[in-house]
């Protein structure tokens, strides 16, 4: 079996090396060598394992979320869960070495301490980690996610954390009930005190330090969760960036946790919140498409902002296209797509 030498450079210049056969994904080959690179869906839909090929040739399935031709600048981007090598490779990873694991992701037990319906079909779930060999603290980077095992199944589901690291072991999520969703169906009958198995933290959708550039956060429905985590960390650290939030939903009744955003507005004096509702709005929300709203604001922005976007593949691609058209460098658009 032919194997090719793979050399991967993390953003902070650390080097990872592993062999990979031509019928094995780069992600699987790394894991076979106990190098666990950030990933999520493993089917090519979420984009969490995107990397860039510096030298060499790969065979790669196109991202399932976007069948348009890649621009020349993005032509070397690959999904590590889909790409297989056809030569030795040098690849660049868009995250620091600290996000690479060399041992299995911790699995822990957590107890449901609160479960509230905050909008039609949307739950606010609060868990408390059970004390174990890791202690009881919840340690993670703002913007990361956890996987939760659906009770009675072998299926894990990924949900972004909306709170920040804490000693009490608290994990908070907002979760949409979808018709085909196993975990949302479970939540309909869940009870306080139920114990769930969780795995993480995972993910590299985190705040980046680029000086005092303005930060614009764009969240589609429950995609607001990791952005709330980032905003809370900014408030805790007293960061003074000009910051703007675009909270996009279909209907006004889909807006939730507005009290949390109001609290953050009090703690972050430079924070501006824009709620964008596709359907006709009556209570002060902006009626209109979030992409068009973003477009108008970018046209008058004094400097290009750093953009953080989380939501559907369509939203992420739409934001990416629009902000880069206004001169925001692609590398300063940070995103996380919902898995499909």
What is each PLM-predicted segment?
Residues 224-236:
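Histidine-anchored nucleotide/phosphate-binding helix
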Residues 54-57, 94-96, 151, 201:
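Short, surface-exposed secondary-structure boundary micro-motifs
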Residues 102-195, 213, 249-251, 277-280:
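Ferredoxin-reductase
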Residues 200-211:
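A short, basic/flexible loop-to-alpha-helix module at the beginning of a structural domain
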Residues 1-83, 89, 241-340:
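Reductase modules of NAD(P)H-dependent flavoproteins
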Residues 78-101, 194-196:
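Short, structured interface segments
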Residues 143, 223, 312:
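Short, conserved phosphate/pyrophosphate- and ester-handling motifs at nucleotide-, phospho-/glycolipid
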């Amino acid at each position: 079996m032919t194997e090719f030498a793979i050399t991967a450079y993390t953003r902070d210049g650390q080097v990872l090396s592993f062999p990979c056969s031509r019928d094995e994904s780069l992600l699987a080959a790394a894991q076979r060598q106990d190098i666990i690179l950030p990933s999520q869906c493993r089917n090519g839909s979420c984009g969490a394992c995107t990397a860039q090929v510096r030298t060499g040739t790969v065979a790669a399935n196109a991202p399932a979320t976007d069948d348009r031709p890649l621009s020349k600048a993005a032509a070397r981007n690959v999904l590590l869960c889909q790409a297989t090598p056809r030569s030795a490779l040098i690849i660049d990873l868009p995250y620091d070495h600290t996000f690479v694991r060399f041992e299995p992701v911790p699995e822990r037990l957590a107890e449901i301490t609160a479960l509230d319906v905050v909008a039609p079909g949307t739950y606010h779930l609060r868990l408390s980690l059970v004390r174990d060999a890791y202690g009881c603290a919840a340690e993670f980077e703002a913007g990361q996610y956890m996987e939760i095992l659906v009770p009675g199944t072998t299926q894990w589901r990924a949900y972004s954390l909306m709170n920040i690291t804490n000693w009490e072991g608290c994990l908070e999520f907002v979760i949409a009930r979808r018709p085909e969703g196993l975990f949302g169906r479970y939540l309909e009958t869940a009870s306080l005190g139920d114990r769930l198995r969780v795995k993480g933290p995972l993910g590299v959708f985190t705040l980046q330090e680029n000086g005092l550039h303005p930060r614009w956060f764009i969240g589609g429905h429950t995609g607001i969760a990791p952005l709330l985590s980032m905003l809370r960390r900014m408030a805790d650290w007293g960061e003074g960036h000009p910051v703007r939030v675009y909270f996009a939903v279909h209907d006004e009744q889909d807006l939730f946790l507005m009290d949390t955003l109001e609290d953050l507005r009090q703690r972050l004096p430079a924070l501006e919140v824009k709620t964008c509702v596709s359907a006709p709005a009556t209570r002060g929300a902006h009626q209109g498409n979030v992409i068009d709203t973003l477009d108008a604001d970018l046209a008058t922005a004094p400097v290009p902002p750093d953009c953080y976007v989380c939501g559907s593949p369509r939203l992420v691609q739409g934001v990416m296209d629009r902000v880069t058209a206004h001169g925001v460098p692609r590398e300063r658009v940070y995103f996380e797509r919902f898995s499909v």
